[in-house]
Amino acid sequence: MTFEAKGLTKNFADKQVLQGISLQTQGGKALGLLGRNGAGKTTTIRIIMGVFPADSGEILIDGQPIRRERINFGYLPEERGLYPKKIISEQLLYLAELRGSSKKAALSAMDHWLQRLEMGAYKNKKLDTLSKGNQQKIQLVATLISNPDFVILDEPFSGLDPVNAMLLKDVVHELIDDGKIV
């Protein structure tokens, strides 16, 4: 799979946030967006995900206009997206099933990612009982549980200590080795 964004622009009211942004990558590769706070990184991600449209430009998958309903995205948002008072395993299974996974596949993927991220002991806990770093790891499990082809990570190292930052780097390398777009 190849991904290309060409000439993306976005304005909010009279403020231009993006001007002519172009990106290109393919499966088995990582693409990073670096920039200052407010530079438009998250806006670019949200346009790619279809949260809102670009004012101009195009997004292509394998040379064709993107059809988001055919792309299995995994998205780790900058802000937390899970319910703090709910049991972790229940949330993860629910999210996987929303994305079309069978219960059996969802259970298998959940157990795999919880173990891989050293979080298996926490699956029956509520999210708000975990540290910020462990909450981030659970959010990553939610991102990966449906085996996405295209993984978008917004501020993925937020709240992670050096050991868990290395663990995340290892997981990203595994995703790349599996042919994912990261």
Located regions from the model:
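Catalytic Walker B motif of ABC-type/P-loop ATPase nucleotide-binding domains
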Residues: V151-E155
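Conserved ABC transporter NBD signature motif
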Residues: G57-I71
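Conserved ABC ATPase "signature" region
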Residues: L93, E97, A105-Y122
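Conserved ABC ATPase signature
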Residues: K126-L130
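The feature captures the beta-strand-to-loop junction immediately N-terminal to the Walker
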Residues: L34-R36
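Helix-to-loop junction immediately C-terminal to a conserved catalytic motif
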Residues: M49
